[in-house]
């Protein structure tokens, strides 16, 4: 199962600017007047020759036509094979994939007239099949391509924005610091870098047909880093699963682990399949800018990614089993805390891996296919946003810490720049904050007899509410 939806969107947008012309007035026995990029043209020609060989073999194996009345003989039209067709019938097949801008969901038609003769184009009086819809970029297709293009840009831009905020939160609030947050920050960084690379590719490479034709090394280097960062995304998620599994199942709630092995797995291991893919791609499928997805070499990268997703999912299932057992036996609060962390990871594993499972079953219906495309592009391009939302913004500990800091800031701001609140106001603020479960600090200032210092801040201090409550009870 190929992780190819993103690159198909890129290729479609590029090819909208450089379609392979199919002249309705020309015979299908000739190749397009303007060739696609050289390497893909060679691949397409091999596919064409293979289809021709299979067609002639099929025509020899099929029995003679058994119908009544005139009919058109089986034939090879130069691009596709056509069986015996009754007179007056319009035959059709799906477009071939010889050329990168041909849409396999569109149809080729060939008409057998009433006399049993294949239709001939009036321009040159040669047998003609209608391939015009294969690369006919209608306004609807153009609009769809632009929508997917800008959806990708918006998704990755939003991902970068939310991930940077999340990193800032984890950096500023040291009380959130722990080993698992360190894993979060590394995973966030991979998504930020990956989104930046994709945006560069979308803005600088995809619309630039001349750059793709020149095929500079920098274009392929950019693709290499995209594949590397994409792999890092999933292997850092595997690190999250391994960490929780070791913490809960293996080490029995051990507090510290050696993170160097996680760095090696998250940053180091993805280099292996990515480097192997780059070498084999350069040798066996060296297309321009490595934009084509019509190669099984992509499994070199996507195979380990899929394996990481499967292993991670089984890790998390085992973690849930252990936690449920412990909660039934001991009702430990710590188990509940870890279970929340596991739930967040379990949500992300199928969410971020769904394209590997669902992609092969794209509906053939145009409307359903379009819905599928929008859904899959949303899941793929907004991955960073989902990661930041689930791991940071929806995290109860993060929310509590931010709320606590905000309440402290407002109280200190009011005391420094605003009027001193009455005792009733302070008590009401403390009570409302305490009801929300937020540890609150109040501003306490000893009264002074010296009018000159009545508005000063000397002698003021921030006193936790629990200290005041202890003194009151005493």
Curated annotation (Swiss-Prot):
Its main location: membrane. It comes from the Eukaryota. Keywords: Cell membrane, Disulfide bond, G-protein coupled receptor, Glycoprotein, Membrane, Receptor, Signal, Transducer, Transmembrane, Transmembrane helix. Isoform 1 and isoform 2 are expressed in a tissue-specific manner, with isoform 2 accounting for less than 15% of the total calcitonin receptor mRNA in osteoclasts, kidney, and brain, but comprising at least 50% of the transcripts in skeletal muscle and lung. Residues 170-181, 243-259, 321-340, 395-474 are cytoplasmic. Residues 1-22 form the signal peptide. The chain crosses the membrane at residues 147-169, 182-202, 220-242, 260-280, 297-320, 341-359, 368-394. InterPro entries: GPCR_2, GPCR_2-like_7TM, GPCR_2_calcitonin_rcpt, GPCR_2_calcitonin_rcpt_fam, GPCR_2_extracell_dom_sf, GPCR_2_extracellular_dom, GPCR_2_secretin-like, GPCR_2_secretin-like_CS. Glycans are attached at residues 28, 73, 125, 130. GO terms for molecular function: calcitonin binding; calcitonin receptor activity. One of its GO terms (cellular component) is plasma membrane. Residues 23-146, 203-219, 281-296, 360-367 are extracellular. It is found in: Cell membrane. PROSITE patterns: G_PROTEIN_RECEP_F2_1 (PS00649), G_PROTEIN_RECEP_F2_2 (PS00650), G_PROTEIN_RECEP_F2_3 (PS50227), G_PROTEIN_RECEP_F2_4 (PS50261). One of its GO terms (biological process) is adenylate cyclase-activating G protein-coupled receptor signaling pathway. It holds the Pfam family 7tm_2. SUPFAM superfamilies: Family A G protein-coupled receptor-like, Hormone receptor domain. Disulfide bonds join 55-81, 72-112, 95-134, 219-289. It is a multi-pass membrane protein. Heterodimer of CALCR and RAMP1, RAMP2 or RAMP3; the receptor complexes function as AMYR1, AMYR2 and AMYR3 receptors, respectively, and respond to amylin/IAPP, calcitonin/CT and CGRP1 ligands. Interacts with GPRASP2. G protein-coupled receptor activated by ligand peptides amylin (IAPP), calcitonin (CT/CALCA) and calcitonin gene-related peptide type 1 (CGRP1/CALCA). CALCR interacts with receptor-activity-modifying proteins RAMP1, 2 and 3 to form receptor complexes AMYR1, 2 and 3, respectively. IAPP, CT and CGRP1 activate CALCR and AMYRs with distinct modes of receptor activation resulting in specific phenotypes. Ligand binding causes a conformation change that triggers signaling via guanine nucleotide-binding proteins (G proteins) and modulates the activity of downstream effectors. Belongs to the G-protein coupled receptor 2 family. This is Calcitonin receptor. It comes from Oryctolagus cuniculus (Rabbit).
């Amino acid at each position: 199962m190929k992780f190819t939806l993103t690159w198909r969107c890129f290729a479609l947008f590029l090819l909208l600017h450089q379609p392979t012309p199919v002249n309705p007035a020309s015979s299908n026995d000739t190749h397009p007047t303007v060739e696609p990029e050289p390497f893909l043209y060679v691949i397409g020609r091999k596919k064409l020759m293979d289809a021709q060989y299979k067609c002639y073999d099929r025509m020899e194996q099929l029995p003679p036509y058994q119908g009544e009345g005139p009919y058109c003989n089986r034939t090879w039209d130069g691009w596709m094979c056509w069986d015996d067709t009754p007179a007056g019938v319009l035959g059709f097949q799906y477009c071939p994939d010889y050329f990168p801008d041909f849409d396999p969901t569109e149809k080729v038609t060939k008409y057998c007239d009433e006399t049993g003769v294949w239709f001939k184009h009036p321009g040159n009086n040669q047998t003609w099949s209608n391939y015009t819809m294969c690369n006919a970029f209608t306004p609807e297709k153009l609009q769809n391509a632009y929508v997917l293009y800008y959806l990708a840009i918006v998704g990755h831009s939003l991902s970068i924005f939310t991930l940077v905020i999340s990193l800032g939160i984890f950096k500023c609030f040291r009380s959130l610091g722990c080993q698992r947050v360190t894993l979060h920050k590394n995973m966030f960084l991979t998504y930020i870098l990956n989104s930046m690379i994709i945006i560069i590719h979308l803005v600088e490479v995809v619309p630039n047909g001349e750059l793709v034709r020149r095929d500079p090394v920098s274009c392929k280097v950019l693709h290499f880093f995209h594949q590397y960062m994409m792999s890092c995304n999933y292997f850092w998620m595997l690190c999250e699963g391994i960490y929780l599994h070791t913490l809960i199942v293996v080490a029995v709630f051990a507090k510290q682990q050696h993170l160097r092995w996680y760095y090696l797995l998250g940053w180091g291991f993805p280099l292996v399949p990515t480097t192997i893919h780059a070498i084999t791609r350069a040798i066996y499928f060296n297309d321009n800018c490595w934009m084509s997805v019509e190669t099984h070499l992509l499994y070199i990268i996507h195979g380990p990614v899929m394996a990481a997703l499967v292993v991670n999912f089984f890790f998390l299932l085992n973690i849930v089993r252990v936690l449920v057992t412990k909660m039934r036996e001991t009702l430990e609060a710590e188990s509940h805390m870890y279970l929340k962390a596991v739930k967040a990871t379990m949500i992300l594993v199928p969410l971020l891996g769904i394209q590997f499972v669902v992609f092969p079953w794209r509906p053939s219906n145009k409307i359903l296919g379009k819905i599928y495309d929008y859904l899959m592009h949303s899941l793929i391009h907004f991955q960073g946003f989902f990661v930041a939302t689930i791991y940071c913004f929806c995290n109860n500990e993060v929310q509590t810490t931010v709320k606590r800091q905000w309440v402290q800031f407002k109280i200190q701001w009011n005391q420094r720049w605003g009027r001193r609140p009455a005792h009733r106001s302070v008590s009401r603020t403390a009570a409302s904050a305490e009801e929300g479960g937020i540890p609150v600090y109040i501003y306490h200032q000893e009264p002074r007899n010296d009018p000159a210092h009545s508005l000063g801040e000397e002698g003021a201090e921030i006193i936790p509410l629990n200290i005041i409550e202890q003194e009151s009870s005493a």
